[in-house]
Amino acid sequence: MYYSSGNYEAFARPKKPEGVDNKSAYIVGSGLAALTAACYLVRDGQMKGEHVHVLEKGDLPGGACDGYKFENLGYVMRGGREMDNHFEVMWDLFRSIPSIETEGVSVLDEYYWLNKEDPNYSLCRATVNRGQDAHTDGKFDISDKGAMEIMKLFFTPNEQLQDKKITDFFDDEVLNSNFWLYWRTMFAFENWHSALEMKLYIQRYIHHIGGLPDFTALRFTKYNQYESMILPMVKYLESHNVQFHYGVQVANVEFDCSDPKHKLAKRIDVIRDGKKEAIDLTENDLVFITNGGCVENSSMGSQNEPAAYNTELKEGGGWDMWRKIAAQDPSFGHPDKFCHDPEQTNWMSATVETLDQKIIPYIKNICKRDPFTGHVVTGGIVTVKDSSWLMSWTINRQPQFRTQPKDHCLVWVYSLFTDKPGDYIKKPMRECTGKEICMEWLYHIGVPEDQIEELATNSANTVPVMMPYIDAFFMPRAYGDRPNVVPEGSVNFAFLGQFAETPRDTIFTTEYSMRTGMEAVYTLLNVDRGVPEVWGSVYDVRDLLNATVKLRDGKKATDMDMGFMEKMAVKKVLGKIEGTDIEKLLKEYGVI
């Protein structure tokens, strides 16, 4: 497997890998990474669909990319997906996945046209004082000292960031700024999370720094992630006769690691219909393992019941499976680095379905748009800056479900601090019913207090979801804590998803999951075509200059607080570049 960039490799079709007709594949899980692996096995690996087996313990595919209406409960979206125009693997695959809505076009075509015709941007990024614009006004509000802290992290070698926290690099100069408000709520970072991952994020999205305050950097699908992404992939795979096995729980994968240069997956232990079974493997049987799981132990409440906070990792789950696998070889990772403390990895979301028009005026007052036009509504999350829960909420294009009533609006609410008492509901979010979470949200969008309970009861249905391990991948880590996608010496197995290691890309993104799927297939089948490298904006001087200026709210480098000697040094450098292309470039991007 090798990386590439440019159209030559992107538009090429690889030859059929040698010996693929004699191989089979078993994929543990059916999340985005797993489905991506299956798609690449079929498309570029040219493996017969009948030879590809997807083992899913639940009744539905998709993993964390869900969206479903539960009978007697309501609509549930545990999370949402923010896309980028440089998710190189994602678009490489979705150009080949047919739309399930429009005949003759791909998922990429559909998505591209939608976001061209209806570009995303926010008209209100944050509120205070019960629905009033917080007037962040597109500013990062970073001091020179704070900017230098970010720059220091940016240039610190990865080797020096092992097991380091964000607070090891940032103090209040950054943590009290609009920059951190935007960043933590958009990506769900906490102060104690990995400094390494923070650095990777800054480098990965350096080309989008200027688009963070108003979300012009983002793109969204038409419907929820399940209907817009997962279903088309499943239909594509089913059309190629890929075998989906639901209700099949993988308890363990057994390996022979006696030869470090020839590690072999020998058996998959499964539980099917309550009975233990074993799938014996040869070197021609490839195994793709989704290890860990950010939505494991997630629980749903209801309008009148809180979601249970269940932190016990039981036998048979994704974390238990990874622990059993990790015990067999040091290169298979250290799961307990990520799942040892759910108090540091949990947050909650809730899906609010409006049942009439009574709440809508308060939404319009904040987002300045009508939710029922089919176009962008909030344009990304609206953060309640003075919320003790650190609540944010968003409304994507409506309807979010094909079956959704035309006059109902779905609102996604999430909070990072589930253990803090609310501002209107005086108890932690994790103890609240759906109705109570809705009441807290209504309070913060400016509904008069004497109407809050009535509207939460009769004008909305709210389903809360607790996810104890949703931020597990953000915990401070070191090299080796996550297994490589294909560990050294592997003959017939690979790891997939957010807890597999691939260089430069960032976790908690659709692209990361899909990249692990592509890399796994290309490596094990020796597919002779380049895997598109992570977009290289961090190596583009134009993006670096633009981000430097935008991060400082348009201030020129010459306006920094400098001593006399520093000013003289800058003046001397500027004299040296006068009349050159360097001066021209620096002026073009507002650096000088």
What are these regions (language model features)?
Residues 203-286, 291-292, 304-305, 311-313, ...:
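Helical element adjacent to the flavin cofactor pocket in flavoenzyme catalytic cores
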Residues 100-207, 218-220:
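Rossmann-like flavin
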Residues 121-122, 126, 481-483, 499-508, ...:
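Glycine- and aromatic-enriched mobile tails/lids
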Residues 206-221, 280, 284-286, 291-516, ...:
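C-terminal segments that line or cap access tunnels to active or ligand-binding sites in enzymes
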Residues 1-25, 43-51, 69, 551-592:
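Extreme N-terminal leader/targeting segments of oxidoreductases
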Residues 1-3, 37, 41, 45-85, ...:
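Beta1-alpha1 glycine-rich phosphate/pyrophosphate-binding loop at the start
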Residues 30, 79, 83, 222, ...:
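Alpha-helix N-cap/helix-initiation motif
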Residues 13, 19-149:
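N-terminal glycine-rich phosphate/pyrophosphate-binding loop and immediately adjacent elements
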